[in-house]
Amino acid sequence: EEGTVTVAFSDGTNAQAKILGRDTVTDLAVIKAEGVSGLKPATLGSSAELRVGQDVIAIGSPFGLESTVTTGIVSALNRPVESSDASGDNATVFPAVQTDAAINPGNSGGPLIDMAGNVIGINSAIRTNSSASGSIGLGFAIPVDLARNVAQQLVEGKKVEHAKIGVTVTPATEEDELTGIGAEIREVQDGGAGDDAGLKAGDIITALNGIPVASSSALVASVRGHQPGDVVEITYLRDGKTETAKVTLDSDGGELSEE
């Protein structure tokens, strides 16, 4: 909450920066360097056009080593990733771009770019095990289309609005209680998007726009990849039968965001 932000430039100069706004849902913020002009912005690409297997480059300052460049490929798309701050609070869930490009502490906030130099993601998180604290080839980036939408709202001085269905869900599994099959609806908000589409408690959502949803976090991540007002197709199980419904996504009103 307190402290200063200093931006370091490649020519060795520094500048103080002002935080224009931040969004705790995606753990993104927009800052403005004070008294600086003539900066050349990076070119933003489109994460919607990404394909698994294409080459990517991650840039950052892992462990304080400035301007470190690592390479890899897009390992997966729409990977539901949940991360929290050091206290274990403020969990964020987003539909990540997974990459095997080495990402370590200090890479967060740096760009993931394609081979044409376009930013296609913002490096955000890694998966590690108990015996390793650095990269094991499982890195995750916030898709640039989502980041662009968040940044635009913050620059305009708004609280960031995220899409929602208006349902409370829990993971649904096979009889082995291990294999995820979807997100089971426990509660439907009266007058919400899910209610208007005819969804009911007990329904198990298995896909969104044809992309499988294997858990409740996967559903949250998929929805957050869209904007309020988008129309999506929900596939769900009801009494053992597969049904579909068109849902016009609601807005959370910016209640989860923070300026």
Question: Which positions does each model-derived feature cover?
Answer:
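C-terminal tail/sorting-segment detector
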Residues: K246-T248
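A structural signal for beta-strand boundary/capping segments at domain termini and interdomain linkers
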Residues: G12-N14, V231, T242-T244
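Short, charged beta-turn/beta-strand-edge "cap" motif at the junction between a beta-strand
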Residues: P62-L65, I211-A214, G240
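Conserved PDZ fold ligand-binding element
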Residues: G194-S216
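Serine-dependent protease modules
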Residues: E1-E177, D190, S217-V220, R224, ...
